């Protein structure tokens, strides 16, 4: 079987000027990074603000399993399929992180014949955006410690410094550290640590800012610490926002690449899908909507996390109105939700598929609560039987939703033409009545309970006393209008990853809350959330190397 990287390497790429021209972008508006990558200039983007927006299509998925659903692959395949049926289309994706690339995933640019290229460049350093975000974040961290060292004018309580440093790598040994050791000349000793770059609030801010002025304003709003009286200290208070914006100036410009079938693709930003909103940048999505008739994008994890945050955070912040949603499901993932162990997924089991469809049905119901019409994409694998596929189609038909078998991994855009036609029919039907789940003026506690009960079907929400008190303080301090960002396991509607299917009446614990004032949301932490991953026993890095011709191998 030909590997993803071999397929990508064999592809014939078009010059970036030709890809840009498909969206009406002039040569002078693109900033080339070699022959196969480019950025779009901010000056050109500013000229688009009065253009009408095209149609926005979200690709999301059922609850993810170790078996994999192929959301990015489907996003790419659908974009190519829409292009094949004559639509002017652009795709918007997140940038991959080096940490997972060398950890468990081994690459994240689609797969098979539904890929974005140049695959190895995208998965490795790309255009340097993550380096810029890491640098801006760590500049802020350095300025905090420097401020404390040189007199501490803002009276920062070093025990209550909230900001940790970041690195775009999985490294568990950096989670908890003591810094400032070695005597007075080397700083003030305190506990600290590192998070992975995609967990940085700077990343979330870059992905939600409208322009450079908004970016600088949001960076200044980051709450970095508290004083002894529990009053908040921001990045603006120590004068950090301007220099941080300078470091992010070029990174803020969207990146443009292409699929194997030359569909223009914006890959820009990549925030965590648990403690942040898990979507590509607002500026890339808005730019694509001003240039294309159809824009296909994705959100991290399953629809209970990714789609909810896409609707309640990104669409709310950006004034976006999605026209349709594509819910990706696989037969093997449905079997796992139906109770089949991973090592038995190859055998036909229609009963397990039917049982697992409870998870699919729950996501369909949830998407309907946002007023967005849905089509189900059955991402095809060779082990799928006709009877299993028919069971999913019948389940969806009984609920008034169309299910379409998609074979894009093997056939590219040709394998998604029927899906593209179904999506186009939904979009042109104009049936979307999008609305967020809750209003801005709902209290923070009520917002958390609304998501928990309406989307997760929790019977109750149990707040740690400290979390509830903190929410009340933020409500009084003027942060009550912010949306909430739920941080919980992606494997279940509950906080228990082992509770698959469609559980109801469970108890959702909220053990901690975090204020992301710059990004503009409040994080509710439900269960254990790791912001600096570790490498597995056999990391993907062990299989990545250069061959005799100097080409990268092992990136799947």
Swiss-Prot record:
ATP binds at residues 65-72. CDD domains: FTHFS. Keywords: ATP-binding, Ligase, Nucleotide-binding, One-carbon metabolism. Pathway: One-carbon metabolism; tetrahydrofolate interconversion. One of its GO terms (molecular function) is ATP binding. Its EC number is 6.3.4.3. It catalyses: (6S)-5,6,7,8-tetrahydrofolate + formate + ATP = (6R)-10-formyltetrahydrofolate + ADP + phosphate. It comes from the Bacteria. Gene3D superfamilies: Domain 2, N(10)-formyltetrahydrofolate synthetase, Formyltetrahydrofolate synthetase, domain 3, P-loop containing nucleotide triphosphate hydrolases. GO terms for biological process: tetrahydrofolate interconversion. InterPro entries: Formate_THF_ligase (IPR000559), Formate_THF_ligase_CS (IPR020628), P-loop_NTPase (IPR027417). Pfam families: FTHFS. Belongs to the formate--tetrahydrofolate ligase family. HAMAP family: FTHFS. This is Formate--tetrahydrofolate ligase. It comes from Maricaulis maris (strain MCS10) (Caulobacter maris).
């Amino acid at each position: 079987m030909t590997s993803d990287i071999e397929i990508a390497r064999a592809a014939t790429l078009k010059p970036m000027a030709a890809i840009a021209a498909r969206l009406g972008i002039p040569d002078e508006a693109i900033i080339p990074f070699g022959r196969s990558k480019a950025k779009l200039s901010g000056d050109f983007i500013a000229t688009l603000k009065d253009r009408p927006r095209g149609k926005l299509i979200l690709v999301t998925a059922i609850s993810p399993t170790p078996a994999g659903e192929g959301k990015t692959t489907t996003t790419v395949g659908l974009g190519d399929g829409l292009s094949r049926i004559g639509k002017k289309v652009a795709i918007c994706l997140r940038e991959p992180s080096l940490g997972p690339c060398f950890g468990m995933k081994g690459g994240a640019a689609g797969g098979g014949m539904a890929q974005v290229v140049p695959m190895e460049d995208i998965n490795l350093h790309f255009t340097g955006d993550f380096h810029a975000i890491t640098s801006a974040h760590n500049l802020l961290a350095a300025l905090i410690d420097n401020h404390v060292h040189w007199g501490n004018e803002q009276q920062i309580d070093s025990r209550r410094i909230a900001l940790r440093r970041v690195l775009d790598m999985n490294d568990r040994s950096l989670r908890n550290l003591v810094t400032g050791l070695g005597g007075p000349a080397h700083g003030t000793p305190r506990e600290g640590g590192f998070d992975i770059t995609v967990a940085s609030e700077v990343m979330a801010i870059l992905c939600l800012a409208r322009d450079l002025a908004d970016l600088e304003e949001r960076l200044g709003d980051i709450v970095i610490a508290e004083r002894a009286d529990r009053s908040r200290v921001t990045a603006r208070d120590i004068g950090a926002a301007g220099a941080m914006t300078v470091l992010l100036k070029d990174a803020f410009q969207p990146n443009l690449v292409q699929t194997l079938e030359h569909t223009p693709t914006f890959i820009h930003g990549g925030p965590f899908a648990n403690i942040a909103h898990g979507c590509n940048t607002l500026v890339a999505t808005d730019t694509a909507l001003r240039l294309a008739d159809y824009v296909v994008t994705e959100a991290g994890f399953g629809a209970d996390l990714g789609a909810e945050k896409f609707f309640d955070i990104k669409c709310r912040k950006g004034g976006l109105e999605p026209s349709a949603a594509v819910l990706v499901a696989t037969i093997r993932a449905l079997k796992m939700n139906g109770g089949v162990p991973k090592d038995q997924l190859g055998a036909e089991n229609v009963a397990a598929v039917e049982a697992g469809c409870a998870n699919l049905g729950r996501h369909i119901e949830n998407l309907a609560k946002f007023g967005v019409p849905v089509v189900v994409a059955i991402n095809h694998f060779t082990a799928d039987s006709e009877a299993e596929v028919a069971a999913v189609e019948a389940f969806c038909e009984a609920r008034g939703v169309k299910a379409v078998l998609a074979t894009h991994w093997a056939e590219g855009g040709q394998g998604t033409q029927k899906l593209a036609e179904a999506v186009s029919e939904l979009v042109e039907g104009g049936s979307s009545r999008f609305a967020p789940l809750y209003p801005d003026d709902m209290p923070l506690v009520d917002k958390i309970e609304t998501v928990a009960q309406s989307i997760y079907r929790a019977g109750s929400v149990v707040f740690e006393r400290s979390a509830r008190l903190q929410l009340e303080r933020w409500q009084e301090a003027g942060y009550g209008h912010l949306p909430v960002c739920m941080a919980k396991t992606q494997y279940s509607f509950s906080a228990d990853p082992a509770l698959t299917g469609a559980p109801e009446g469970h108890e959702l614990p909220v053990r901690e809350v975090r204020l992301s004032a710059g990004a503009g949301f409040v994080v509710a932490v439900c269960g254990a959330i790791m912001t600096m991953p570790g490498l597995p026993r056999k990391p993907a890095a062990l299989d990545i190397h250069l061959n005799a011709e100097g080409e990268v191998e092992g990136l799947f």
